[in-house]
């Protein structure tokens, strides 16, 4: 092969500083979001026990996931409208602030508020990272980014619960939430450089942003109300909040999914329905197994973490 062809191939294969910075920041941020989503599952029985609020277990476990899914729906439209910079930094701030609030929360209600903010930030910060891949990474390197992102989602499920269980046993559950914001700050450093190299995008029309935000907010609120119903004292309050949550979810969710999803229409709708059913069973088991092992069988947080893994 001629020397000039070899050097040209090497130039195409080499990584730019912006690509390296984006890879470091994005992988670390996704790892942190996935870690907090999975690690909290293991230690949540200890958290609600410390507040003497066992009835709040469902909402404490699910608030972050509900708000994360709601934020993910609107993050793409927001990134198109305002650019990825604002959405990414807003997501990082909300994610870190939510973790700090959860770590220092004096009551279970404040803890749930922190969890909701954490999920909101996690949903906002992930989508702009995919947008930045298109702006920064060369087509040759984009598959590497997507493979690294997949690993960043999977790896915390293998080691996160065990780490969280051990930290909770040795130092307490507060550290599982309180230490992660420091890593968010570290992850923000390379991405600041990356965003300086990305030209400001032209503002686009906010296509369906208002309707997406409304439907996502109502769907997330409905799911949170379904979880909150079990924490209320009176049966009448439980029934009323459950009915309201079910009505909001039933109204908003079909508007966020392809038509025919709940009728299992052939093609994408049936594929999404299959994913919904699989995720529902997986999340339900992941939430309940630690509770059963720790409350019924008196397992420690570290021991039950291995079964979650």
Descriptions of predicted regions:
Residues 1-15:
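Short, Lys/Arg-rich, polar N-terminal cytosolic tail immediately upstream
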Residues 169-278:
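Hydrophobic transmembrane-helix bundles of small-molecule transporters
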Residues 43-47, 131-132, 136, 194, ...:
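A residue-level signal for alpha-helical anchor/packing sites in multi-pass solute transporters
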Residues 19-26, 88, 95, 111, ...:
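Hydrophobic alpha-helix/TM-entry signal in multi-pass membrane transporters
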Residues 75, 79-208:
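Helix-loop-helix hairpins in multi-pass membrane proteins, especially solute transporters
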Residues 48, 52-59, 147, 301-309:
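Small-residue hotspots at the loop-to-helix junctions and early N-terminal turns
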């Amino acid at each position: 092969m001629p020397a000039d062809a070899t050097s040209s191939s090497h130039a195409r294969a080499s990584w730019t500083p912006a690509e390296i910075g984006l890879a470091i920041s994005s992988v670390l941020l996704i790892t942190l979001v996935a870690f907090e989503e999975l690690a909290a599952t293991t230690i949540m029985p200890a958290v609600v026990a410390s507040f003497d609020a066992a009835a709040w277990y469902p909402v404490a476990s699910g608030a972050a996931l509900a708000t994360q899914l709601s934020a993910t729906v609107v993050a793409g439209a927001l990134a198109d409208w305002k650019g990825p910079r604002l959405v990414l930094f807003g997501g990082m701030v909300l994610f870190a602030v939510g973790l700090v609030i959860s770590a220092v929360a004096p009551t279970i209600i404040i803890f749930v508020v922190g969890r909701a903010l954490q999920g909101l930030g996690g949903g906002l910060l992930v989508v702009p990272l995919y947008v930045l891949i298109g702006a920064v990474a060369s087509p040759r390197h984009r598959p590497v980014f997507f493979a690294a992102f997949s690993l960043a989602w999977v790896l915390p499920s293998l080691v996160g619960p065990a780490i969280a269980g051990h930290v909770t046993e040795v130092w307490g559950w507060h550290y599982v939430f309180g230490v992660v914001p420091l890593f968010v700050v570290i992850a923000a450093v390379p991405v600041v450089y990356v965003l300086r190299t990305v030209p400001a995008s032209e503002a686009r029309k906010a296509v369906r942003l208002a309707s997406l935000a409304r439907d996502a907010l109502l769907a997330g609120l409905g799911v949170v109300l379904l979880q909150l119903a079990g924490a209320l004292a009176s049966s009448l309050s439980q029934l009323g909040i459950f009915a309201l949550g079910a009505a909001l979810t039933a109204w908003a969710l079909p508007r966020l999914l392809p038509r025919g999803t709940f009728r299992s229409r052939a093609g994408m709708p049936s594929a999404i329905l299959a994913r919904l059913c699989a995720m529902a069973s997986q999340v339900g088991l992941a939430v309940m197994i630690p509770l059963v092992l720790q409350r019924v069988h008196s397992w420690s947080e570290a021991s039950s973490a291995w079964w979650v893994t």
